[in-house]
Each structure stands twice: as structure tokens, then as C-alpha cells.
From Swiss-Prot:
SUPFAM superfamilies xrefs: Metalloproteases ('zincins'), catalytic domain
Molecular function terms from GO: metalloendopeptidase activity; zinc ion binding
Disulphide bridges: 347-506, 372-392, 510-546, 517-539, 526-543
Enzyme class, first EC level, given as a word: hydrolase
Keyword Chaperone carried by entry: no
UniProt protein name: Zinc metalloproteinase nas-9
Cofactors, names only: Zn(2+)
Residues spanning the signal sequence: 1-14
Tissue specificity of this protein: Expressed in hypodermis, uterus and spermatheca.
Gene that this sequence comes from: nas-9
A biological process from GO: proteolysis
Free-text function comment from the UniProt entry: Metalloprotease.
Binding site for Zn(2+): 401, 405, 411
Boundaries of every ShKT domain copy: 510-546
Length: 546
């Protein structure tokens, strides 16, 4: 969603700066502005015209398609991609003062901390090389400041034994051992770790177009402006950069700037800010005036839903869903079958509505080979878009996987206890996708006492993100010959998947009061005499006490 936002790195320096300097030496820039991509071809486009307001009864699937067709024109010459915009200008004739002023103002909205944007000033056209160079090395300092959040410590005031046990298991979010770091470092000797691929750039631009169309269709006049949508993508990239910084790898690796976290997860701005706080990035960036993109305090309960019912779906009535016009009839059947499998195995019901009001799931097709599906984790405001490519096989299973994300379920292989069950071959991972293998922050997700399952529909396959596709990146530590083929299955919900959903949604009043309850339950604390009373009172779901 989030997506724009080329937070540019050394590859831009290598490719753009010589080109710009040559333009200056010749007294003009080469080429013409017509090289800009006015609209990604990878997304389904609807007919011309915006259509009406979905709240007025217009089919939401039609509306999103109509808006998507116009987003490119509304954005102008790649206006959402500031650096790409500069690149296009550098190849054409010198723009008029009015045209350059418009682009310079847009740049300063995106990067309010840039030295050329201070005290009401704007960069000049001759500043283009300096602008690019500054962003390459200091983008995080130029974006709106990361807000400092009041994050509750779930271990505060607890029994020393419970605290000590969690700390003995807890690996610091994003941390690597020296051996693991060296293995990744060695990979970069033969892998272009400091260059952004064109595929990432294209995927991000396509996703931005789709997300802008969705926000406009669902939010109407209340939809966030382009800069606000762009900031989600900037924050996502900042999280990936911060993870590499924590692992002491940021000086050699440029994370994939594709707008996506962990291959198929979209981060809201609040979720990204939470992760940045956990990674020590709170307060980084520039102050912006009223209406700026990054301010405001967000309470802990507003980010993910383990400690708050706010982000959970109300399942006392069916969850509304709608199907975009981009979907073929066979695609719609796969989605309906996926929702049916969830419903027959749990208490969660779904109801189709062509003109949904309020929170709902919105399924859309994206003609992309870069991902199978994308979704937010947990319920989002005003609705949850779920993007599916239908190009990976097991379409019904992929739809279930992404719907599970929307219901609030994280990936199996990022659990706190992951390293007890699988071994990551750090020497074979794509270093630019390090976020795919970094164990989740322990404060965010709970297992609800369900055991690690190799066959979970929420597990990735053994070869995901591999440099050498013939070698696995994830190797089961228990019976690898039998369990390796199970990783990444999308045929059905497993017993563990169903049990987790039931604990999350199907036991009214049976809640955990601490995000670590699932971990304690799996290690027998529900039945230990010294901890039994506290566990049974505070970890009812994980201890199966209701």
C-alpha cells in the first residue's frame, strides 16, 4: 500500500550523477521528458472516468478500476517518484521556472529536512546533482521525523522467572551473530547488494498506483493525499534499512525498495513507526509544519491488536468483502472457496457486498510476477485491500494466506521460537531481502500457545529468497527429509492454523493479557505450580482455560 519514494542509494549515484554532470558540461540535458512512464502496465485498468461515490451505491469494483485509469494522469509526469522525476528532467530541455518550481515544491514536501528546503527556500535546477547525492546517503534524516511512541514493556512488573525465561529466548529484533553477518557479507562479493533492481522500481510504482486508486475509491474526499501514501512506502523502506543497520550491514546492502515488507506484508504508517521505535530510530528526521506527514503520538494499543480489540474484526456479524472488476470469474471462485474453507473450520463468517460500508476486505488482481499476494496484518482503516496476482499456482491457498494476514496472523517462520525448528542458510539468502528472515519483534505477535507447524499455510517455502534456487534457505531441524516439502504448502488450512484462528476469534472473553503468553504456555508454565495461578488468570487463551 505502502507503498513514491525512491529512497535512493548508491545505484542511483552510479547511474544518474554522471549523466547529470555530462548534461551540465554540454550546457543542456539530453533526451526529452516523454520518457516518463505515465502509468504502469502491470495493473488492470478500468474505463475512463472516476465514476461515483461508493457510498452512493456505485459498485466499488467499477469505481476502483475507473480511478486507477486516471491516477497516472493525476500524478503528472511520474510526480509520485521524486527522484525518477528528476532523472526525466535531466534528460530533457531545461524546464520553465514555473515547471521547476512545482517539482521543487513537491521535492521539499517529500524531504522537508533537505538543506535546500530550509527557511522557505527551494532548490534550484542547478542543484539537481547535489540533491541526488544528499538523498543517497541521508534520506532518513530528510524525511518527516519518526514520532516517539509510548510503547508498553510487556515484561514490566512480572515475576522474575517469567521475565528471565523470555529474555533467555529473545533475540534482539534484527540482530545477527558475527558468523551470520559474515556469511551475508561474503554473499555481497558476488551479488549486487548495493544496486536497486528495475523490477523493484517497477513493482513499487505499480503498487503505488493501485493503492492511490483504492484510497480514493474507499475514502473519497477523506482519502490521504499522494504525499501521505508515499510516506507509508518511505517508512517501510526505513524499517528495512534500520534492520540492516541493526545487523551492521547497512554499509554494504541496499534493501529492496519495492514498498513491501517480508515479501507480502504491507505496513501502515503507524505499524512502521512502531517498528522504527523498536529499532532505535524514534526521533530521526525533520520537523514539519501542521499537516506534515510524520507527526503525532500513537498509543501501543493502536499498533497491531494483541493487546487491544481495536484491530480485531467484529465477528459477531459476517465480515464484509467485495470483489474488484479486475478479477476473472475463476479468480472470484478461488477467493470464495478460500473464505468458505475458513468459515467451515472456524466461527468466522464472510458476506459479499458490492457496495460495502465500513470495514471490509477488498480483493483485487494485480498482473505482477513479483509477488503472489499482498495484505496488511490486522484490520485497517477504512478497509483492507488484498492484492492477488493469480500467477503462483494454488490460488485458493494464496487467497487464504493473505486473508489470514488480514485477520491478524503473522508468518510462521518469523516466530520467536523459529530457530528451534528451522535453520536459516544465511549464505544463500538474497541480502536485499534480509527483512524476510529477521525474526519478528517479540512484542508484536503471539502464538496463543499453538505449536510451530512446518505445514502451516502461513509458512514460506524452503527455497524462498535463495541466491541459488537449488539450495534451500530454510532447513527443518526435525526430520528435514519429511518436513522440507511441507514448507510453503498452500493446499489447505492445517490443524494448527485452525486452532490459532479459533483462539483469536471464537472464544468470547477468553483473551491473553500479555503478548508472551503463548511462549510461556508452550514451555509448560500454565501447569507449573509457582506460575499456574497467574498464568490461568492472565493467559486464558494460551492456557486453554475457557
Amino acid at each position: 500500500m505502502i507503498f513514491l519514494l525512491f529512497v535512493v542509494f548508491p545505484f542511483v549515484y552510479a547511474q544518474l550523477l554522471p549523466e547529470l554532470l555530462a548534461g551540465f558540461q554540454n550546457g543542456r540535458f539530453r533526451g526529452g521528458p516523454d520518457g516518463f512512464n505515465r502509468g504502469p502496465g502491470g495493473f488492470h485498468r478500468g474505463p475512463d472516468g472516476f465514476g461515483g461515490d461508493p457510498r452512493g451505491g456505485v459498485d466499488l469494483g467499477h469505481l476502483i478500476g475507473n480511478i486507477a485509469a486516471n491516477v497516472g494522469q493525476e500524478m503528472g509526469l511520474n510526480d509520485a517518484d521524486v527522484i525518477g522525476d528528476l532523472r526525466g528532467i535531466s534528460r530533457g530541455p531545461r524546464p520553465s521556472s514555473m515547471e521547476w518550481g512545482r517539482r521543487a515544491r513537491h521535492f521539499c514536501r517529500r524531504y522537508p529536512g533537505h538543506p535546500k528546503c530550509q527557511r522557505g527556500q527551494l532548490p534550484q535546477f542547478t542543484d539537481v546533482p547535489t540533491i541526488i547525492n544528499t538523498i543517497i546517503y541521508n534520506a532518513g534524516d530528510l524525511l518527516p521525523r519518526v514520532p516517539t511512541l509510548n510503547i508498553h514493556d510487556p515484561l514490566a512488573g512480572l515475576n522474575s522467572e517469567l521475565v528471565g525465561f523470555i529474555k533467555s529466548l529473545q533475540s534482539q529484533f534484527g540482530q545477527l551473530s558475527s558468523q551470520q553477518r559474515n556469511e551475508i557479507h561474503d554473499s555481497c562479493r558476488s551479488f549486487k547488494c548495493d544496486q536497486q533492481s528495475p523490477q523493484n522500481t517497477q513493482a513499487k510504482q505499480e503498487l503505488l498506483t493501485k493503492m492511490l486508486a483504492f484510497d480514493q475509491a474507499v475514502g473519497g474526499k477523506a482519502a490521504p493525499a499522494h504525499d501521505k501514501v508515499n510516506l507509508r512506502f518511505d517508512r517501510t523502506q526505513q524499517v528495512k534499512q534500520a534492520l540492516l543497520k541493526r545487523a551492521n550491514l547497512s554499509h554494504i546492502i541496499v534493501p529492496a525498495d519495492n514498498g513491501v515488507f517480508d515479501r507480502d506484508v504491507l505496513l501502515t504508517e503507524h505499524q512502521a513507526n512502531f517498528l522504527l521505535n523498536e529499532l532505535g530510530e524514534a526521533g530521526r528526521g525533520a520537523d514539519v509544519g501542521a499537516g506534515g506527514g510524520g507527526g503525532g503520538r500513537v498509543p501501543r494499543s493502536g499498533v497491531f491488536f494483541q493487546e487491544s480489540a481495536v484491530q480485531k474484526w467484529d465477528i459477531w456479524k459476517p465480515i464484509q468483502y467485495t470483489l474488484d472488476d479486475s478479477l476473472e470469474e475463476s479468480d472470484k471462485k478461488d477467493i470464495r472457496d478460500a473464505l468458505h474453507e475458513i468459515s467451515i473450520n472456524t466461527c468466522i463468517l464472510f458476506r459479499y457486498n458490492a457496495t460495502p460500508k465500513g470495514y471490509h476486505l477488498n480483493y483485487m488482481k494485480v498482473d505482477s510476477t513479483t509477488f503472489c499476494g499482498l495484505s496488511y496484518v490486522g484490520r485497517t482503516d477504512p478497509a483492507n485491500p488484498i492484492y492477488l496476482s493469480f500467477q503462483c499456482g494454488d490460488n485458493r491457498g494464496v487467497a487464504m494466506h493473505e486473508t489470514m494476514h488480514a485477520l491478524g496472523v503473522s508468518h510462521q517462520h518469523l516466530r520467536l521460537d523459529r530457530d528451534k525448528y528451522i535453520k536459516i542458510d544465511w549464505s544463500n539468502i538474497d541480502p536485499q531481502h534480509y527483512d524476510t528472515f529477521a525474526i519478528s519483534d517479540a512484542k508484536l505477535y503471539t502464538s496463543y500457545g499453538t505449536k510451530y507447524a512446518y505445514d502451516s499455510i502461513m509458512h514460506y517455502n524452503a527455497y524462498l529468497g535463495a541466491k541459488d534456487p537449488n539450495k534451500p534457505t530454510m532447513i527443518p531441524l526435525v526430520n528435514p527429509q519429511e518436513n522440507t516439502p511441507k514448507l510453503g504448502q498452500r493446499a489447505k488450512l492445517t490443524r494448527g492454523d485452525i486452532r490459532l484462528l479459533k483462539k483469536m476469534y471464537c472464544r468470547p472473553g477468553c483473551d491473553d493479557q500479555n503478548v508472551h503468553c503463548g511462549t510461556w504456555a508452550l514451555h509448560g508454565y500454565c501447569k507449573m505450580k509457582e506460575q499456574m495461578k497467574w498464568m490461568n488468570e492472565n493467559c486464558k487463551a494460551s492456557c486453554d482455560k475457557c
